[in-house]
Amino acid sequence: MLTIDIHTHIIPEHIPDYTKKFGYGDFIHLDHHKPCCARMMKGDKFFREIEDNCWSPEKRMDECAHHHVDVQVLSTIPVMFSYWSKPKDCLEVSQFLNDHIAGIVAKYPKKFIGLGTIPMQDPAMAIKELERCKQIGLAGIQIGSHVNDWNLNATELFSIFEACSKLDMALFVHPWDMMGEQKMTKYWLPWLVGMPAETSLAICSMIFGGVFERLPPAVPDHGADGPVY
């Protein structure tokens, strides 16, 4: 029996400075300030420090062997979703990230499965990128627990879920942009409280909003902090 870790985030080692390119916003880029580590920067603000296992598939395979994990399912770090940005700019970021993951999967097909990201704030554009994700060998997509002001039962989003079903693409829902974050500045509360709350918001919106009733049968599976369909 294979041991598969479905919740593993990855980003490219080098990311364009989209804030400078597009002229607005706090897009993520990396500051490689020392060997084997980098600072994730939101515009000019520090976000998080990461190690090389966040971008190196070879380092990941070594760690997987140590922990007896056979396969990792790769998805981007949710802060990269960029749903707040202009759709065409979000599409460019998404395609860059999706091509990166697809390249790793193509190079190590027995070790990695890939999930894409799409510009959910523009459903028509999102579906086109979803179709492209299928073409380049990704197994599904990762989406946020909400899309700006839309919860996941929003009628605007249903066509995306319908397209996932028709294309047989998995849907991994990951909490992000946590509610009440301004009140939770200590004790890692955005992760300990905000992420479970966002997950509840997402799954309840889909259940009570009748999303599953309108789609072919699906079995939700709750991972570390996000349901998979």
PLM regions and their residue ranges:
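Helix-coil boundary/capping segments in enzymes
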Residues: 1-229
